[in-house]
């Protein structure tokens, strides 16, 4: 039985992750963390009351194996660091980490010999989309990314879009696309510039998480797209990560590292 605590349990992703833990036979929800929650316990599905922790140090009393984090960027880094320092393997879906923070956390995990995962996207289909895009970029160097999310998402572009761009750049040299003399009549019209690759962010109500990688070449085009219509699409990856991190001795970045 893997003992799990969930941080950010009241958010969309956090609540879905909490439900997944409760419904999974080999997982045990030993607590939830929210520094702003006044209640001392909370019940899910009218079952046993689960302790709510407002201070990080309080979490240690239930000795979790895994710390699931779907919070906000300014909280996720100290949360993840705390988890690693106290023997908990973090599974983090919060985006917005800097490269320096990821490197620091990776080094700490190696020191402590504790596994962990930070992943921009836990949907298996999204991970495959990124891998397919990386493969296609070897033959189609002209590419743009369009990512679409619900209008409450805080960061843009999405972590998935950034990760996709990074994977593409591993196999494709920096390349400025479009007409060298092009002019934006409205600033930002061509999207964010990632080493010549353009990323476009759409935020609309009714969306969940979607991404399209658009390739173009002489006389042909290739579109690779993934759609998450429900947040449950991410839970297969979260469950997989929870089982994997307790067997590993290093923090990884990207769910593809565990597939």
From Swiss-Prot:
Reaction equation(s) it catalyzes: (S)-2,3,4,5-tetrahydrodipicolinate + NAD(+) + H2O = (2S,4S)-4-hydroxy-2,3,4,5-tetrahydrodipicolinate + NADH + H(+); (S)-2,3,4,5-tetrahydrodipicolinate + NADP(+) + H2O = (2S,4S)-4-hydroxy-2,3,4,5-tetrahydrodipicolinate + NADPH + H(+)
UniProt-recorded name of the protein: 4-hydroxy-tetrahydrodipicolinate reductase
Active site (UniProt): 149 (proton donor/acceptor), 153 (proton donor)
GO cellular component: cytosol
Keyword Oxidoreductase part of the UniProt annotation: yes
Function, in words: Catalyzes the conversion of 4-hydroxy-tetrahydrodipicolinate (HTPA) to tetrahydrodipicolinate.
UniProt-recorded Gene Ontology molecular function terms: 4-hydroxy-tetrahydrodipicolinate reductase; NAD binding; NADP binding; oxidoreductase activity, acting on CH or CH2 groups, NAD or NADP as acceptor
Residues that bind (S)-2,3,4,5-tetrahydrodipicolinate: 150, 159-160
Lineage: Bacteria, Bacillati, Bacillota, Bacilli, Lactobacillales
